[in-house]
């Protein structure tokens, strides 16, 4: 939601290591920074350097978490883990998915260099996120990718989002609401 407004720096770490590095980076900015946390990530066990908590994750630098050659999958937060799992299942069917953790979601911080390099390699893009389509980043991101990298695309940019319904409060409805395999 905040990524749709100019002037905000929006960071969305998908793991504890990135959270610490991005938090340290955010503390250096004078601009307003929103750090999006997802409650479903709190239980994850991630490695962080015990001897050095002063590292930085560069603002505006996406992370290619899985190399691939058939489709580029752009995601963030809990989507990273879900998309890595889906990529493993696709690999068993002979489809090679490149998964990119966007990390930074605002317009000025979007890493179009990394996205573009991947699009040129795969020719196909899928944006996966948990937000309802009407409030999602996927529409703006799909438009931008189609404008910037049209000559490299073999098909329109695909989007996987949550349905346009109010966010559920029960665990069972939440599981049905969140895009999954």
Language model regions located:
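Glycine- and acidic-residue-enriched helix-capping/beta->alpha junction motif
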Residues: 26-32, 141-145
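Thiamine diphosphate
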Residues: 39-181
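Conserved thiamine diphosphate
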Residues: 1-29, 167
